[in-house]
Each structure stands twice: as structure tokens, then as C-alpha cells.
Design a protein with these regions (language model features):
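Core catalytic region of metal-dependent phosphoesterases/phosphodiesterases
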Residues: 6, 11-88
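Conserved catalytic scaffold of divalent metal-dependent phosphoesterases
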Residues: 66-121
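Extreme N-terminal starter segment of soluble prokaryotic enzymes
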Residues: 1-4
Length: 121
């Protein structure tokens, strides 16, 4: 299986467009968070739509820079791996979005206890 893995997009669609040949050649796009810069659902939808032009097979988690509404968008589209596992062929993908607390204020952080609850679910 050929993967196109990306993280820390922060709303920038130009690099995605430049990677079109790689995305089209992949079997699956994996987004490992920080989809937005402005943290909004609208910006996340724009980034996801850009990727969807080139691939319909996407798995993703929201990042600590993304608001919960971005997680909700990924879930609505069936792309979210937050607290879930999904098999793609013989390969398992498992995810946890956001982050543990950081020195800087970010949109989505989880305490160690919250992380443990998600991972145990």
C-alpha cells in the first residue's frame, strides 16, 4: 500500500496542489493533525476539499491547533481516526487527535486522564 502522509498543513493548500502526483499515486492519504491555521471548520473543509480532488481515501486526526469542530468535520466525512482503529487491507491505523498540554496555548489539548480514557475506549 502506498501512503501519502502529511501533517502540519496549517491551512496551506499550495503545497498540497504541488504534491498532486504523489497524492494521486497513493492508495491512502493520512493526515496527522494541524489541518488549520485559523482553527476553523471552514478552513479545514477547504483543505480537505483540496485533498479530495486528488484522493477519496483519507484517514485523519485533528491536531492540537485544530478546534473540536475540525474533529467533528472529520467524523462527519468518515475520515476521523480519533479514538478509533480502522483496517485498510491488512494494515491497521489507529489515532488520537489533539495533544497533551503544551507550553503554548493551543485549540485542542487533552489531559493525561482524558487521553487514557480515549485510548481505553
Amino acid at each position: 500500500m502506498k501512503l501519502f502522509a502529511v501533517s502540519d498543513i496549517h491551512g496551506a493548500t499550495k503545497p498540497i496542489e504541488r504534491a498532486t502526483p504523489l497524492i494521486r499515486a497513493s492508495d491512502l492519504v493520512v493526515i496527522a493533525g494541524d489541518i488549520t491555521h485559523t482553527k476553523t471548520r471552514a478552513e479545514a473543509a477547504e483543505v480537505i476539499a483540496c485533498i479530495e480532488q486528488f484522493s477519496g481515501r483519507i484517514l485523519a486526526v485533528h491536531g492540537n491547533w485544530d478546534k473540536i469542530e475540525v474533529k467533528d468535520l472529520l467524523e462527519e466525512k468518515g475520515y476521523s481516526l480519533h479514538g478509533k482503529g480502522r483496517m485498510m487491507g491488512e494494515i491497521g491505523f489507529f489515532g488520537l487527535g489533539g495533544s497533551s498540554p503544551t507550553p503554548i496555548k493551543t485549540a485542542t489539548t487533552y489531559t493525561e486522564e482524558e487521553i487514557a480514557l480515549v485510548l481505553q475506549a
